[in-house]
From Swiss-Prot:
InterPro entries: Chromo-like_dom_sf, DNA-bd_7a-e_arc. This is DNA-binding protein 7b. Can constrain negative DNA supercoils. May be involved in maintaining the integrity of the genome at high temperature. Its main location: cytoplasm. It comes from Saccharolobus islandicus (strain HVE10/4) (Sulfolobus islandicus). It comes from the Archaea.
């Protein structure tokens, strides 16, 4: 699977697209929630131009 690299609260993070639960658009940013493990949910955002195509495909699927 593909990984998404992003910054959250000044910290560089990356998450596998298979762990992403929900995706939505906020202006030119793509926001998402993902499973951190241990029952925790993480949040992240990446600019539309830096988003991998798999993340954009997930966004399109959720719109329908």
């Amino acid at each position: 699977m593909t990984t998404v690299k992003f910054k959250y609260k000044g910290e560089e993070k990356q998450v596998d697209t298979s762990k992403i639960k929900k995706v939505w658009r906020v202006g030119k940013m793509i926001s998402f929630t993902y499973d951190e493990g241990g029952g925790k949910t993480g949040r992240g955002a990446v600019s539309e131009k830096d988003a991998p195509k798999e993340l954009l495909q997930m966004l399109e699927k959720q719109k329908k």
